[in-house]
From Swiss-Prot:
SUPFAM superfamilies: Undecaprenyl diphosphate synthase
Keyword Disulfide bond: no
Protein name: Ditrans,polycis-undecaprenyl-diphosphate synthase ((2E,6E)-farnesyl-diphosphate specific)
Catalysis: reaction(s): 8 isopentenyl diphosphate + (2E,6E)-farnesyl diphosphate = di-trans,octa-cis-undecaprenyl diphosphate + 8 diphosphate
PROSITE patterns: UPP_SYNTHASE
InterPro entries: UPP_synth-like (IPR001441), UPP_synth-like_CS (IPR018520), UPP_synth-like_sf (IPR036424)
Active site: 11, 59 (proton acceptor)
Pfam families according to UniProt: Prenyltransf (PF01255)
Role this protein plays: Catalyzes the sequential condensation of isopentenyl diphosphate (IPP) with (2E,6E)-farnesyl diphosphate (E,E-FPP) to yield (2Z,6Z,10Z,14Z,18Z,22Z,26Z,30Z,34E,38E)-undecaprenyl diphosphate (di-trans,octa-cis-UPP). UPP is the precursor of glycosyl carrier lipid in the biosynthesis of bacterial cell wall polysaccharide components such as peptidoglycan and lipopolysaccharide.
Cofactor: Mg(2+)
NCBIfam families: PRK14830.1 (NF011405), uppS (TIGR00055)
Family assignment from sequence similarity: Belongs to the UPP synthase family.
Binding site for Mg(2+): 11, 198
């Protein structure tokens, strides 16, 4: 049993660097290399979607020098890796609140998405300047605007309709969430979409995450009985 959609909270870059007496940015550089390896590995498996939590809205409260470095690293990674993603038939999508991005970042995101949008292999989702609460709020705001313009009535509102206004509404919800670094929390990531997601916590810091760790998470998923509110007996039928 392989999950259709795997999401990963890539945590631990800073701690990885600190344990080695290195600046935090060294951890982020090491983490970026792991992203490339794991995407390549995931693309070889029968996964449909891989979503990576790269930068949260709350991360903007970090020291400005670190935020600037991360934005530069993301931009550079997009420039360097888009052609390789395209060659591997990977479709790239970047989700999140993009109002904080400069023109260079916005242009590169558009270029990368346009180049890969017709690819039929792994769908790679990068959550950049994203948070689960923001996602829910923007969905509410869009629905409220439709009601205001008389394009929608409150009587028609439902969980199913609301879900259509969230990011990734056209994709299956995550079956498996992997959280690295030993922390055990969602960190405001895809709060609506994780309603029935299986969660795997690994002590591995993100720069130490590898193909074996990924396979361990997939093995954990295969042990789970997904019930979606039903009894075990109902599921077994």
């Amino acid at each position: 049993m392989i999950p259709r959609h795997v999401a990963i909270v890539m945590d631990g870059n800073g701690r990885w660097a600190n344990r080695r007496g290195l600046p935090r940015v060294a951890g982020h550089r090491a983490g970026a290399k792991v992203v490339r390896r794991i995407v390549e590995y995931a693309a070889e498996k029968p996964l449909e979607v891989l979503t990576l939590f790269a930068f949260s809205i709350e991360n903007r409260a970090r020291p400005q020098s670190e935020v600037n470095f991360l934005m530069s690293l993301f931009l550079d990674s997009l420039k360097k890796n888009t052609e390789e993603l395209h060659k591997n038939n990977v479709q790239l999508r970047v989700i999140g609140d993009h109002r904080e991005f400069d023109k260079k970042m916005l242009a590169q995101i558009q270029t990368s998405q346009d180049l890969t949008k017709h690819n039929t292999g792994l769908k790679l989702i990068i959550a950049l300047n994203y948070s689960g609460r923001w996602d829910i709020l923007q969905a509410v705001q869009r629905m409220a605007e439709k009601i205001k313009n008389q394009e929608l009535t409150s009587e028609l509102m439902s969980a199913e309709l609301f879900q259509n206004y969230l990011c990734l509404s056209d994709l299956p919800e995550p079956d498996l969430l992997i959280r690295t670094s030993g922390e055990q929390r969602l960190s405001n990531f895809m709060l609506w979409q994780f309603a029935y997601t299986e969660i795997y916590f690994t002590p591995a810091l993100w720069p130490d995450f590898n193909e074996e760790t990924f396979d361990q998470a997939l093995a954990f998923y295969r042990t789970r009985q997904r019930r979606f509110g039903l009894t075990p007996e109902q599921v077994e039928k």
